[in-house]
Every structure is written in structure tokens, then in C-alpha cells.
Amino acid sequence: MNIQCKRVYDPAEQSDGYRILVDRLWPRGIKKTDLALDEWDKEITPSTELRKAFHGEVVDYATFREQYLAELAQHEQEGKRLADIAKKQPLTLLYSAKNTTQNHALVLADWLRSL
């Protein structure tokens, strides 16, 4: 299973395969016509409450990860659909967060690999 995470601000590459935006909000500074993507999947993004708590530093990354995984458990069918895509071709999860080592896309990628 080939799953990678990439910032939306990085250039698209042919090796990205199927590109999914996994942010609940559209990324700032990018026109919808300018972003190369195959779909925008809001269903598997962190809830608004969890996203705000994490970005407002109310919860740390470990707590965020635990709570987001609990939310993802409610979307197993959608997760399996994405995992099936990743079994057939590369899957790139696009996100806008500045932090490339602690973000929801990385949690999502790990969860998809576990399905």
C-alpha cells in the first residue's frame, strides 16, 4: 500500500497518483481551479472541535491523535474505500498544515495502512 502525505502548496507530481485533499476547509491562497486533485474528502477530516482544540494548543499531539483515531473509527467504510485505492495506485493525502511532522494527514495515513 503506497500512501504519502504532501502539503497542498508543494507541486503535484505524476508519482502522486490519486490526490485527495483531507482538510475540512479549503487551503488559503489557492484557487479551486489551481489545485490538482482527484477529490476533496471532508468526511474523514478531524471534527471542527478537535481541529480547533489542536490548532489552539488546547490539546497536545498525542491527545489529538488519540481523539482523531476515535473519530476515524466511525468512518471505517470510507477508510476502506481509500485503502482500496492505495492498494491499486499511489495515494497522496493533501493537507495545508505548516507542521509536517505532527498533523492529521499523518494520523490518517497510519490509520489507512492499518485497515
UniProtKB/Swiss-Prot annotation:
Q: Name one Pfam family in it.
A: DUF488-N3i
The family note in this entry says: To M.tuberculosis Rv3073c.
Question: What is this protein called in UniProt?
Answer: Uncharacterized protein YeaO
Task: Give the lineage.
Answer: Bacteria, Pseudomonadati, Pseudomonadota, Gammaproteobacteria, Enterobacterales
Q: Which gene encodes it?
A: yeaO
